[in-house]
């Protein structure tokens, strides 16, 4: 067992090639035993690329509004207080709404497999008619 106190896990990092738009991650717990825990902050319109996790991912939204979408077409809005479980192997993306930031706590278990970017058309379609 280990308890991580305060900011011992490192400074905020701006994320790059596996995201569209500006995204920052704040390591909450230094990754170990294939478990990563990060606070992630998306500016309006920012999002992950399509990706999947070896075991699973849990997202808990702490502020703003966003979206979670699977490659199979399932998805929906995310708002503060929502928690989502994404099973291992399920291709998905998540990010902020076009007109709102989104912040979530991400708990990822197992390796991440980063795939292609979410097109602007697919991103816009997710929010059409919401």
Outline where the language-model segments fall.
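A short, N-terminal "cap"/entry segment at the start of jelly-roll beta-barrel domains
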Residues: 1-35, 114-130
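Conserved short histidine dyad/triad with adjacent acidic residue
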Residues: 38-53, 88
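Short beta-strand His + acidic residue motifs that chelate non-heme Fe in jelly-roll/DSBH
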Residues: 48-50, 68-69, 91-98
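Glycine- and acidic-residue-biased ligand/ion/polar-headgroup-sensing regions
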Residues: 54-66, 71-72
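A short hydrophobic beta-strand segment most commonly corresponding to one strand
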Residues: 58, 85, 99-117
């Amino acid at each position: 067992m280990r308890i991580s106190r305060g900011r011992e896990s490192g400074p905020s990092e701006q994320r790059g090639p596996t995201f569209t738009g500006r995204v920052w991650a704040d390591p909450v717990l230094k990754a170990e035993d294939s478990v990563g825990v990060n606070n992630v902050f998306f500016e309006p319109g920012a999002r992950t690329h399509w990706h999947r996790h070896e075991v699973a991912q849990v997202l808990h939204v702490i502020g703003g509004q966003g979206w979670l979408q699977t490659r199979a077409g399932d998805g929906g809005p995310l708002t503060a207080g929502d928690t989502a479980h994404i099973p291992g192997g399920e291709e998905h993306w998540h990010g902020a709404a076009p007109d709102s930031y989104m912040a979530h706590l991400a708990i990822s278990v197992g390796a991440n497999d980063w795939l292609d970017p979410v097109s602007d058309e697919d991103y816009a379609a997710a929010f059409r008619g919401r």
